[in-house]
Amino acid sequence: MLKPGITLYFVRHGETDWNAVRRYQGQTDTPLNDTGRAQAARNGQALRRILDGTSANFDFVASPLLRTADTMRIIRREMGLDPDAFAREDLLKEINFGHWEGQIWDDLPNSDPDEFAARKADPYRWRPRNGESYEDLSKRVGNWIASLERDTVAVSHGGVSRVVRGHILGVDWGEIHALDVPQDKVLRLRRGEQAWL
């Protein structure tokens, strides 16, 4: 749960070529594509309007992976801020998909049917070989949420967005895997409520 009075603006990184074909990225470092750079610019313009000169009152933090750090750089540039003046936080890295990283989602029912069925049966607790479950991720991200002391703009990943909403909004853990994770919107979380901007 966010400490009282704190607002979190959460942005998922812009699209990558792997996103475009539904390939699991996890903690594999992949660059933004042209669509992703445009999405990041749109989100930066939105935050510039929303924060309207109050950005000095916010902490800026991103996952250290390439696609998130580059998204934050573009956002900050669009806001008229130093593109590199933000913190990198390992707790905000995407869920580690283990042996599924690099695999295309639509291929998994045929290429790994047993694991695909196990994930479908318990998407919150299922853990890929050499990877993390959503339960593991929720513990990691919960530690980050508890550490927030100021209003914050964060750039991270789809899985992280889901567990952030689980913690802050009380979304049922068994349902978080199905939450929408757009790359062209800013999510505002405050006072236990969300708004897509």
How should each PLM-predicted stretch be described?
Residues 8, 58, 147-159:
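Generic beta-sheet signal
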Residues 6, 15-81, 132:
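Active-site-proximal alpha-helix that buttresses catalytic centers in soluble enzyme cores
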Residues 142-150, 189:
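Alpha-helix C-terminal capping segments
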Residues 9, 61, 87-89:
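General small-molecule cofactor/ligand-binding pocket signal
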Residues 14, 62-65, 91, 156-159:
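Short, well-ordered beta-to-alpha junction loops that form the rim of enzyme active sites
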Residues 31, 77-140, 190:
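Phosphate-handling substructures
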Residues 171-197:
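Domain-level recognition of soluble alpha/beta enzyme cores
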Residues 17, 67-69, 94-95, 160-163:
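Short, active-site-adjacent cap segments at secondary-structure transitions
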